[in-house]
Curated annotation (Swiss-Prot):
Disulfide bonds: none annotated. Residues 1-26 are annotated as: Disordered. Binds directly to 16S ribosomal RNA. Belongs to the bacterial ribosomal protein bS20 family. Keywords: Ribonucleoprotein, Ribosomal protein, RNA-binding, rRNA-binding. The lineage of its organism: Bacteria, Pseudomonadati, Pseudomonadota, Gammaproteobacteria, Pseudomonadales. This is Small ribosomal subunit protein bS20. GO terms for biological process: translation. InterPro entries: Ribosomal_bS20, Ribosomal_bS20_sf. GO terms for cellular component: cytosol; small ribosomal subunit. PANTHER family: 30S RIBOSOMAL PROTEIN S20, SMALL RIBOSOMAL SUBUNIT PROTEIN BS20C. The gene is rpsT. GO terms for molecular function: small ribosomal subunit rRNA binding; structural constituent of ribosome. Pfam families: Ribosomal_S20p.
Amino acid sequence: MANSPQAKKRARQNEKNRKHNASLRSMARTYMKKVDAKIKAGNHDEAQAALKEAQPIMDSMVNKGIFAKNKIARHKSRLNAKIKALKSA
């Protein structure tokens, strides 16, 4: 357990930041799931719009250090590929 005042403060800040980051992570995942749901529904235009809405949020999570850059790039790439496959199908 933290003994010095600054260590106690850091422990408080770490807990607060952990909770905040968890909510941001959850929000980003929700946006990704919304895009996936639109893809599974088979609606190309809605899926494209949902991805357009989700991309800036996903990018901001990278800038905040919530997700790794490659993870978000991989998700965006896969979602985009699924949407393109929808259009051709």
